[in-house]
């Protein structure tokens, strides 16, 4: 199994921590005035999203995780599994709710996603940065009702709820940023 020395560690690298795949979020090299230099590594476990920090000596190493990021198309959900297909090999995989990582609320069908596979099993799904979804339910915007910040909740066709401006009405299509879960624009 491959491993990384502390000089090779960079943000975004996939590592193995207690037999769990993780991605490095932040690294900080510290050289105190007295004593040996060390590196602080902050990482996020891919499966459950927990963030942890560890301090390592310059002679330590981290094991590389054998994970693969693959572009796949979302096909459908049967309630228990979300089904994805590789557009080149037509290979299909099924992701559980835990493997979806909250991405299920942005997918309605045919979206291109980045699926992280570990031992051939999907452990994390990253939806596209922006999706266009139809508003199925929202209150009508009343003119002059801006004391609460000028926004209102809207339920989308996938069941997700986002805050939208008062001028957006029901049955309109909006663009949503999936990274922050916020309204981005109205689609014509």
From Swiss-Prot:
Recite the UniProt keywords alphabetically.
Cytoplasm, Elongation factor, Hydroxylation, Protein biosynthesis
Disulfide linkages recorded for this protein, renumbered to the chain, are: none
Record-annotated membrane-spanning stretches = none
Q: Does the keyword Chloroplast apply?
A: no
Show the InterPro entries listed in the entry.
Elong-fact-P_C, NA-bd_OB-fold, Rib_uL2_dom2, Transl_elong_fac_P/YeiP, Transl_elong_KOW-like, Transl_elong_P/YeiP_cen, Transl_elong_P/YeiP_CS, Transl_elongation_fac_P
User: What Gene3D superfamilies does the entry give?
Assistant: 2.30.30.30, Nucleic acid-binding proteins
What pathway is this protein a component of? Protein biosynthesis; polypeptide chain elongation
Citing just one GO molecular function, the answer is: translation elongation factor activity
* SUPFAM superfamilies per the UniProt record, alphabetical: Nucleic acid-binding proteins, Translation proteins SH3-like domain
User: Which SMART domains does the record cross-reference, listed alphabetically?
Assistant: EFP, Elong-fact-P_C
**Coiled-coil zones:** none
List the GO terms this entry assigns under cellular component, sorted alphabetically: cytoplasm
Q: Which residues carry this modification: N6-(3,6-diaminohexanoyl)-5-hydroxylysine?
A: 34
Q: Where in the cell is it found?
A: Cytoplasm
Name any Gene Ontology BP term. peptide biosynthetic process
Modified after translation how? May be beta-lysylated on the epsilon-amino group of Lys-34 by the combined action of EpmA and EpmB, and then hydroxylated on the C5 position of the same residue by EpmC (if this protein is present). Lysylation is critical for the stimulatory effect of EF-P on peptide-bond formation. The lysylation moiety may extend toward the peptidyltransferase center and stabilize the terminal 3-CCA end of the tRNA. Hydroxylation of the C5 position on Lys-34 may allow additional potential stabilizing hydrogen-bond interactions with the P-tRNA.
- Family that this chain belongs to: Belongs to the elongation factor P family.
Protein function: Involved in peptide bond synthesis. Alleviates ribosome stalling that occurs when 3 or more consecutive Pro residues or the sequence PPG is present in a protein, possibly by augmenting the peptidyl transferase activity of the ribosome. Modification of Lys-34 is required for alleviation.
What protein name applies here? Elongation factor P
Where is the organism placed in the taxonomic lineage, from the top?
Bacteria, Pseudomonadati, Pseudomonadota, Gammaproteobacteria, Lysobacterales
Its gene name is: efp
